[in-house]
Design a protein with these regions (language model features):
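Class I S-adenosyl-L-methionine
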Residues: 1-103, 114
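A contiguous loop/helix-start segment that scaffolds small-molecule binding in enzyme catalytic cores
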Residues: 3-5, 73-74, 151-244
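Fold-independent oxyanion-binding glycine-rich loops
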Residues: 8-12, 33-35, 52-54, 79-81, ...
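Short gly/ser/thr-rich secondary-structure transition/capping motifs
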Residues: 9-15, 137-139, 201-203
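Class I SAM-dependent methyltransferase SAM-binding "motif I" and its flanking Rossmann-like core
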Residues: 12, 84-152
Length: 244
């Protein structure tokens, strides 16, 4: 049988793809982080739903692999896209011991693109996505990536800017960026994408340093071509300049 690693998209499921919905309908078992299982529980009352808490990712993926290897179609659900800070890579790594198991990754809408749509069009040119979580990546590595992305004039999208224990990571990241970029650089944040309390704000890099982010926040730092147009964050692709 098959293990499907499924992206639920943003929020409570309104942004889920038709492919993802079809897979969840077809699978006998749905596995995921407790909060994500709760998002789909009402829609799939007749499925077997299995969940594990935060920081039990290895256990969760092994559970899904074992159930699929036993002959069932299993869906491992992730928020956003399973290949962007999701469970796709871990499932594929752990499945090395099950070479006969078929694994399919079902893409979803990630916070970078869903958040960008709420702000306007900040990702229309080259961009870098960086997580500020240092749980699995040393902070020194994160700082180096931030600095290099700023020097290269990428638009930067930040995932995981804060948590209950990581309250100052966004400020520290802004300090790194401010060593390369002006405080007036256009930025934006989106909170609770697709959920109650959804919010999109546009301000400067200097103002971003003082912003109180949480684990449901996605941050955008513009490049030299990023402007605020009618309260929307817009990065030029260059078409108008080509016509001049």
């Amino acid at each position: 049988m098959t293990l499907y690693v499924v992206g639920l998209g943003p929020g409570a499921g309104a942004g889920m793809t038709a492919q993802a919905r079809a897979v969840l309908e077809a699978c006998q078992v749905i596995v995921g982080y407790t909060a994500y299982i709760n998002l789909v529980r009402a829609d799939y009352p007749n499925k077997e739903l299995l969940s594990t808490p935060m920081r039990s990712e290895v256990e969760r993926c092994r559970m899904a692999i074992e159930r699929a290897a036993s002959g069932e179609d299993v869906a491992m659900v992730c928020s956003g896209d399973p290949g962007v800070y999701g469970m796709a890579s871990l499932c594929l790594e752990l499945a090395e011991d099950h070479p006969a198991l078929d694994i399919e990754v079902i893409p979803g809408v990630t916070a970078a693109t869903s958040g960008a749509a709420l702000l306007g069009a900040p990702l229309t040119h080259d961009f870098a996505v960086i997580s500020l979580s240092d749980l699995l990546t040393p902070w020194e590595t994160i700082e180096r990536r931030l600095s290099c992305a700023a020097k290269a004039d990428f638009v930067i999208c930040l995932y995981n800017p804060a948590s209950r224990k990581r309250t100052d990571h966004l400020r520290r990241a802004c300090d790194v960026l401010l060593s390369e970029l002006p405080a007036t650089r256009c930025c934006g944040v989106v909170r609770n994408i697709g959920r109650e309390g959804e919010q999109a704000l546009v301000f400067t890099l200097g103002e971003l340093r003082e912003y109180q982010a949480d684990m449901f926040t996605t941050v955008f730092i513009g490049n030299q071509q990023t402007r605020v147009i009618c309260e929307r964050l817009v990065t030029s692709r260059g078409y108008l300049q080509r016509e001049d």
